[in-house]
Swiss-Prot record:
E.C. number: 2.3.3.5, 2.3.3.16
Binding locations of substrate: K82, H200, R283, R350, R369
Chain's role: Involved in the catabolism of short chain fatty acids (SCFA) via the tricarboxylic acid (TCA)(acetyl degradation route) and via the 2-methylcitrate cycle I (propionate degradation route). Catalyzes the Claisen condensation of propionyl-CoA and oxaloacetate (OAA) to yield 2-methylcitrate (2-MC) and CoA. Also catalyzes the condensation of oxaloacetate with acetyl-CoA or butyryl-CoA but with a lower specificity.
A molecular function GO annotation: citrate synthase activity
Species assigned in the record: Salmonella typhimurium (strain LT2 / SGSC1412 / ATCC 700720)
A Pfam family assignment: Citrate_synt
UniProt keyword list: Transferase, Tricarboxylic acid cycle
Enzyme class: transferase
Catalysed reactions, semicolon-separated: propanoyl-CoA + oxaloacetate + H2O = (2S,3S)-2-methylcitrate + CoA + H(+); oxaloacetate + acetyl-CoA + H2O = citrate + CoA + H(+)
Record-given protein name: 2-methylcitrate synthase
Length: 389
């Protein structure tokens, strides 16, 4: 037992954190994911994230979450073929995207694109599991198309063809972004990153999706709500801020000196610590290796060395460990991903987890309606309007 966790009936309970509302309070049951049961572990449907990230393509993990099992090779090939065929955008969705200004927040574009798709290809009445899975697959396949169709049209007037022959979601994203097939190394890096971001239990956006699903609403509405929650800087965007921090400096020494001063001044350094993990973020060790490999291949280790030095500084000064976002920033930057697309990439990965939770919440078939602790005044006498001061 540590000062941060307690064990009750063999169940790991997180000691509440003052900065996180409802921290440590169970809000429902799930068979999809466990986070931090031992302080630094993560499992999707019982599988260790380290095994999944090491051995699986992202599409395997998407199938695990959305369809309930790791696919056989034949099932994986069929699933990837299905996703390839779903990358296109209906004409009216493209029209909506063309109307959005270049200054739009990419997360607003994602939200709007999903809403337009939901109007064009609405969920059928009855809300079947198979129908929800089909919508999840359509979104998984076409979110990159939504983002990058808007991006290229709004920035240079180009109407790209969103369908490519790339074998993976990550490869499709990079191909649409850069206009050419990515290297195998970049595609592998995307597989790993998307796997790491795919699911994370009852985080704010996932819980939002479950609350909406619990009302009996459609899949699109639940996903749109989740995107809205992830847009908030207290939930999404940490890897964007992480890169901004890393890019302030020219050398690791400069970075260390400045961050030590900021820590002394009690400034918050984004990219470190976690509301649930108490020992380490298990995803960190994986993405750090990816960041180093990409940096070495790109012939530029500057950002990696700065990030690595600050990892040491934050542990020495605050005993705070880096989370997934810290070296994801380095990885995405080395693949030429614009900073404003970091959180939309989070959406592309997490739509798999959101969809799985929506389906699970529907099967529970209960509306989520918690109580509140009232903190207002009691038993106030009513004063008519003419007598009020």
């Amino acid at each position: 037992m540590t000062d941060t966790t307690i064990l009750q009936n063999n169940t790991h309970v997180i000691k509440p954190k003052k900065s996180v509302a409802l921290s440590g309070v169970p809000a429902g049951n799930t068979a999809l994911c466990t986070v931090g049961k031992s302080g630094n572990d993560l499992h999707y449907r019982g599988y260790d994230i380290l095994d999944l990230a090491e051995h699986c393509e992202f599409e395997e993990v998407a199938h695990l979450l959305i369809h309930g099992k790791l696919p056989t090779r034949d099932e994986l090939n069929a699933y990837k073929s299905k996703l390839k065929a779903l990358r296109g955008l209906p004409a009216n969705v493209r029209t909506v995207l063309e109307a959005l200004p270049a200054a739009s927040h990419p997360m607003d574009v994602m939200r709007t694109g999903v809403s337009a798709l939901g109007c064009t290809l609405p969920e059928k009445e009855g809300h079947t599991v198979s129908g929800a899975r089909d919508i999840a697959d359509k979104l998984l396949a076409s979110l990159s198309s939504i983002l990058l169709y808007w991006y290229h049209y709004s920035h240079n007037g180009e109407r790209i063809q969103p369908e490519t022959d790339d074998d993976s979601i990550g490869g499709h994203f990079l191909h649409l972004l850069h206009g050419e097939k990515p290297t195998q190394s970049w595609e592998k890096a995307m597989h790993i990153s998307l796997v790491l971001y795919a699911e994370h239990e009852f985080n704010a956006s996932t819980f939002t999706s479950r609350v909406i699903a619990g009302t009996g609403s459609d899949v699109y509405s639940a996903i749109i709500g989740a995107i809205g929650a992830l847009r908030g800087p207290k939930h999404g965007g940490a890897n964007e801020v992480s890169l901004e921090i890393q890019q302030r400096y020219e050398t690791p020494d400069e970075a260390e000196a400045d961050i030590r001063k900021r820590v002394e001044n009690k400034e918050v350094v984004i990219g470190f610590g976690h509301p649930v993990y108490t020992i380490a973020d298990p995803r960190h060790q994986v993405i750090k290796r990816v960041a180093k490999q990409l940096s070495e291949e790109g012939g530029s280790l500057k950002m990696y060395h700065i990030a690595d030095r600050l990892e040491t500084v934050m542990w020495e000064t605050k005993k705070m460990f880096p989370n997934l976002d810290w070296f994801s920033a380095v990885s995405y930057n080395m693949m030429g991903v614009p900073t404003e697309m970091f959180t939309p990439l989070f959406v592309i990965a997490r739509v798999t987890g959101w969809a799985a939770h929506i389906i699970e919440q529907r099967q529970d078939n209960k509306i989520i309606r918690p109580s509140a602790n009232y903190t207002g005044p009691e038993d106030r006498p009513f004063v008519s309007i003419d007598d009020r001061c």
